[in-house]
Amino acid sequence: MMTTSVLRMIRSGGGWQLLDDGRPVFWFPERNKGLEIARLMADARSLNHGTRTMLEVQNDDDAMETIAAFA
């Protein structure tokens, strides 16, 4: 069975918090910069370790939305 990792961007403190499997790892003042780093992390994790990684972002309705998957 393949392990799946989840990176999540949530609103926090006037910016965006990046969570790695529920653990806070970075805070960004801008959503786009956070997404840029999160995509890079997810892609690297998939390429280097073969770990399936999902990237989820909190939308305007406060629901989590999957915006990318790296396998």
Residues covered by each model-derived region:
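A short, exposed loop/beta-hairpin motif centered on an aromatic-Gly-Thr core
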Residues: 21-33
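Short, mixed-charge low-complexity intrinsically disordered segments
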Residues: 47-71
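Charged, amphipathic alpha-helical segments
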Residues: 3, 30-43
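Short aromatic-glycine-(Arg/Gly/Cys) micro-motifs in beta-strand/loop hairpins
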Residues: 1-24
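Generic marker of residues within folded, mature protein domains
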Residues: 8, 45-47
